[in-house]
Amino acid sequence: MNIDVVLLLQQNPILLIFVVLAIGLAFGKVRIANMQLGNSIGVLITSLIMGHLGFSFNAEALTIGFMLFIYCVGIEAGPNFFGIFFRDGKHYFTLSMVVLVTAVSISYFASHYMGLDFGLSAGMMAGALTATPVLVGAQDALNSGLATIPRNMEFSLVLENLSVGYAMAYLVGLISMIMFAKLLPRLQKQNLSDSAQQIAQERGLGGSGQRKVYLPIIRAYRVGPELINWTDGKNLRELGIYRQTGCYIERIRRHGILAHPDGDAILQEGDEIALVGFPDSHARLDPSFRNGKEVFDRNLLDLRIVEEEIVVKSDAIAGKRLSDLNLSEYGCFLNRVIRAQIEMPMDLDIVLAKGDILQVSGEKSRVHGLAERIGFISIHSQIADLLAFCSFFILGIMFGLVTMTFGQVSFSLGNAVGLLLSGITLGFLRANHPTFGYVPQGALNMVKDLGLMIFMVGIGLSAGGKMFEHLTQVGPQIIGIAFLVSVVPVFFAYLVGAYVLKMNRALLFGAIIGARTCAPAMDIVNEYAKSTIPALGYAGTYAIANILMTLAGTILIILS
């Protein structure tokens, strides 16, 4: 049996999509100079080659790809967006606006000066900023009629220009941002590591702001004469065992009766006590604990230690510092703090926001008691609330179709903005109502990444046919403008953040990278800072920048 592979792929668009995805994802794992190409570049290059070979793509599949992507971006941003915007928005919003206003200005004036065709400037800016939301906003403005296409151009040609501009500028944007992350920390006067340590000292952090994560252990001891002498008649509150060592007494057996002690309890000779703490905490116990006979009793040691992710929801807790939680009162241990999927430094002075996730371990009843106070335990379920997911998706599309009229001017927000807003709403409601709209993070990541990759396949296949033709005609101009769009806004943001906003350099670099939504550069800055402190700045600008970039794409294509 003979199989014509080319004909098979041309007649089966779904098969073509996944063939390009599989080859592109495999290609993305290739490393060049210790840097992995990544999924986006792998899929983009593969689809460009396939497009150049004459393969085409279904435009409807391209549309569903970007819709799913932008909707999931909104859901991820929702839990933290309003808190960041209204509480810490001054610096983060300013930096995001500096980056985008500068990028839009350079793209608009440079493309007009160079005489680039309609659509190339928006695609080029999206690629230079490595920001797919810019491209999504521009394309949706065309689909909704918000942007007017020149009379001498076909709609398909404009979409092709968007794709070509994006594809040609993407590598320029990614490489230049990574170079910025490597070079600018060296060129500035302040050492990034020193800046991170300064924040660490001001906020009570130690070292890198990281710690190993492991569950506490339980050990039991019989109270002997040495320990009685050490306690000197003081109650547990006065002894401050937790403050000194990080261990706390979970149970006491006295005269055969098990009990949970309170702060007023006084140890007596012959008591058997169960202590909970990390291994290094047990090692800090006074020798009079360990010199007593260690007890191996199933009933005494039968404690259920759990590790849960607690989502901050309470209005009384949001806006307070981590130190205000007084975890020692609950006998709980904090392992990590996660905001916008970014692990934060273990900073006792970090201000909590709704939607923050605290990974806490301890005895089950104590952890659940803490969760009732600050929010709720994240549902560890593999079942997504598809009804809410689909309903808000529909609402987003419907909202984007609403036409508003001002005098003789009519316009609609379009699918991109509508889905972004509905996604933010769903994410926000999910952060405040644990049983509503739950989507496992793994499932959300898969839908978002799949939508983005399908969108990238469409971009590459659409651009591939004309890619080399454009390279010979306007390639140098697009690459030159893309370099300016990628680099100049970053330097402006650095100057504004450093000398106008007076931001700490470690936080500033994280915030700039968040404004550029360039995750690969984040690891480089953390490495230079020898800390995860820059992640505080990254999380602050990331949610805001994703929203503004979608609007920037819409604005630029309208102005072009």
Swiss-Prot record:
Q: Name one Pfam family in it.
A: Asp-Al_Ex
Q: Which GO terms describe its biological process?
A: potassium ion transport
List residues of the RCK C-terminal domain.
Answer: 203-292, 293-376
What is its membrane topology?
A: Multi-pass membrane protein
- Transmembrane stretches, start-end: 5-25, 37-57, 66-86, 91-111, 164-184, 386-406, 409-429, 443-463, 478-498, 506-526, 539-559
Which SUPFAM superfamilies is this protein grouped with?
TrkA C-terminal domain-like
Gene Ontology cellular-component terms for this entry are:
plasma membrane
Q: Which GO terms describe its molecular function?
A: monoatomic cation transmembrane transporter activity
Which of UniProt's keywords are assigned here? Cell membrane, Membrane, Repeat, Transmembrane, Transmembrane helix, Transport
Does the keyword section mention Transmembrane helix?
yes
InterPro entries for the chain: AAE_transporter (IPR050144), RCK_C (IPR006037), RCK_C_sf (IPR036721), Transp_YbjL_put (IPR023017), YidE_YbjL (IPR006512)
Cell compartment(s), UniProt = Cell membrane
Family, according to the entry, reads as follows:
Belongs to the AAE transporter (TC 2.A.81) family. YbjL subfamily.
User: HAMAP family, alphabetically?
Assistant: YbjL (MF_01015)
Q: What protein is this chain from?
A: Putative transport protein VV1438
Q: Per the UniProt entry, what species is this protein from, by scientific name? A: Vibrio vulnificus (strain YJ016)
Provide the taxonomic classification: Bacteria, Pseudomonadati, Pseudomonadota, Gammaproteobacteria, Vibrionales
